[in-house]
């Protein structure tokens, strides 16, 4: 009988560990989904900013290298 109790206790401990691991895995999965959402949003913003920068560079505004220095130089 004591051996059966030990086995039951070990099974219960293993079941608790599995439940904890499943919960942790779900939390990690959700964190990964959230991070991917943020990454997608940042990539979209980066594309937008790159497009805006390209538009500014191709406009009639001279680059800093082409600008004449201010009179106090």
UniProtKB/Swiss-Prot annotation:
Annotated transmembrane regions: none
HAMAP family in the cross-refs: SlyX
Family statement: Belongs to the SlyX family.
Stored NCBIfam families: PRK02119.1
Protein name according to UniProt: Protein SlyX homolog
Protein species of origin: Histophilus somni (strain 2336) (Haemophilus somnus)
Top-level taxonomy: Bacteria, Pseudomonadati, Pseudomonadota, Gammaproteobacteria, Pasteurellales
């Amino acid at each position: 009988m004591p051996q059966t109790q030990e086995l039951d206790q070990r099974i219960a401990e293993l079941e608790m560990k599995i439940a904890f691991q499943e919960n942790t895995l779900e939390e990690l999965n959700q964190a990964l989904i959230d991070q991917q959402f943020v990454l997608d949003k940042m990539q979209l913003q980066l594309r937008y900013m790159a497009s805006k920068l390209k538009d500014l560079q191709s406009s009639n505004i001279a680059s800093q290298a082409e600008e004449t220095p201010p009179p106090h130089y």
